[in-house]
């Protein structure tokens, strides 16, 4: 069976060639955009992806701790602990992190979207956002299953608290909203507090940030 994450990672990446004083230099497109402090969070969230995103965030902080970072998100979600490592790093570093959903920000993707700097969380007009509670499956001894179930409930409460912090909604509202898969249009996501603005072009995004 083909691993969909391997298929995604093996997608052909365009190269960009630049003229420098030492001649031509080639970058893959993502490395070139990283020079502009742009990070792409595309595809399922897992340990491999989170380590790359965290490394990029820390690199950009070391390069310039006062200049903002832009994170473009198109993700169906994924492993909660992997996503939380990205979330914690976003809150830990000094630069402000602007987030923009392109396509979709679902599950853990929606949490990372709303974790951007207040006033700097954006959506393109045809994107969608989906929030829900964490899920998991376990097998083994009954006691171990009970332990894992209790841990999942603790994780659910912690995720709810993070949404409360960044959306301004009360805990009961968040818990109700995340009870099932809850798809939102950009307008609904803005009203709920997951994003700050819906942007159609770059000039509007720049105006919103200023």
Swiss-Prot record:
CDD domains: S14_ClpP_2. Pfam families: CLP_protease. GO terms for molecular function: ATP-dependent peptidase activity; ATPase binding; serine-type endopeptidase activity. Disulfide bonds: none annotated. It comes from the Bacteria. Its main location: cytoplasm. Keywords: Cytoplasm, Hydrolase, Protease, Serine protease. It catalyses: Hydrolysis of proteins to small peptides in the presence of ATP and magnesium. alpha-casein is the usual test substrate. In the absence of ATP, only oligopeptides shorter than five residues are hydrolyzed (such as succinyl-Leu-Tyr-|-NHMec, and Leu-Tyr-Leu-|-Tyr-Trp, in which cleavage of the -Tyr-|-Leu- and -Tyr-|-Trp bonds also occurs). HAMAP family: ClpP (MF_00444). This is ATP-dependent Clp protease proteolytic subunit. The gene is clpP.
């Amino acid at each position: 069976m083909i691993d969909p994450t391997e298929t995604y990672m093996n997608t052909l990446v365009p190269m960009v060639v630049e003229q420098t004083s030492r001649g031509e230099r080639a970058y893959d497109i993502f490395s070139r955009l990283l020079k502009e402090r742009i990070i792409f969070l595309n595809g399922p969230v897992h340990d491999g992806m989170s380590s790359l995103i965290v490394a990029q965030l820390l690199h950009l902080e070391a390069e310039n701790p006062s200049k903002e970072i832009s994170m473009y998100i198109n993700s169906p979600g994924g492993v909660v602990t992997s996503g939380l490592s990205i979330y914690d790093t976003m809150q830990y570093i000094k630069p402000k992190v602007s987030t923009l959903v392109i396509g979709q920000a679902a599950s853990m993707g929606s949490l990372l979207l709303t974790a951007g700097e207040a006033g700097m969380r954006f959506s393109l007009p045809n994107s969608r956002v989906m929030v829900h509670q964490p899920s998991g499956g376990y097998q083994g001894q009954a006691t171990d299953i009970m332990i894992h179930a209790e841990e999942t409930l603790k994780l659910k409460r912690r995720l709810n608290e993070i949404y409360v912090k960044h959306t301004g909604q009360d805990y009961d509202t968040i818990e109700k909203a995340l009870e099932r898969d809850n798809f939102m249009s950009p307008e609904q996501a803005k009203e709920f507090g997951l994003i700050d603005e819906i942007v159609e072009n770059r000039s509007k995004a720049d105006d919103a940030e200023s």
